[in-house]
Amino acid sequence: MADEHAFWAVTFDRLEYADGLSSNLGSVSQYDAQAWYGTSYERLVIKAEGELADNTLAESETQILWGHALSTFWDRQIGLRFDSSEGPSRQWLTFGVQGLAPYWFEVDTSLSVGPEGRTVFNLEAEYELLITQRLILQPRVVVSAFGKDDTKNGVGKGLSSLTTGIRLRYEFSRKFAPYLGVEWTGKYGNTADFAQLAGQPVRQTQWVAGIRFWF
């Protein structure tokens, strides 16, 4: 059967340039990619996202996961996650699910557990609204929450950040699409307090321009 054969794919959902609207927000480059190898039922999955500022990797998140199909539209995933930022690097054991929710919302959610009782919950949801067969509007929401304060990395217990954005892309083909958009990010709770103490913005708005492609 075809489902028993191994396949692979690499997708860059976001490869973009982002520019802040206020004078205290600089421009950055951002990426969000995923690669997998395996069958329809079992596969190795690598997820990578990050941000570059002044030609330097400012922060990154990399996950190496094993995925198992729970149903036609949902995969269960387990593996390791590695975070790096201005503070100490963090390592996690990650459990998650990824798939299509009712009404065709793309959902990627995970719970990660680290040393010293650290935990983090992440939720990302996207939806594609077809204006035409090639012009697509994509709202996106990302939520992060932590189980305890991590002062060295500037994140606090509870709801840490909420990002909402909308991107309009034009698909020259199913494999290549440039886009424009805008994104709003807010920090909350202790994370907002840590940001203010460090002289960083708690709310920010950015215009984004990039490409989405896969092979």
Specify the residue positions occupied by each region the protein language model found.
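Residues that define the transmembrane beta-barrel architecture of outer-membrane proteins
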Residues: 6, 27-31, 58-62, 89-93, ...
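Repeated loop/turn-to-beta-strand initiation elements of outer-membrane beta-barrel proteins
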Residues: 40-46, 72-76, 103-107, 132-137, ...
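Membrane-embedded beta-strands of outer-membrane beta-barrel proteins
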Residues: 33, 64, 95, 123-125, ...
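Outer-membrane beta-barrel initiation region
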Residues: 1-56, 60, 68, 189, ...
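Outer-membrane beta-barrel "beta-signal"
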Residues: 166, 171, 201-215
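Transmembrane beta-barrel strands of outer-membrane/channel proteins
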Residues: 14, 46-50, 78-82, 109-113, ...
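Residue-level signature of outer-membrane beta-barrel architecture
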Residues: 37-39, 68, 99, 113, ...
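Detector for outer-membrane/organellar transmembrane beta-barrel domains
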Residues: 89-150
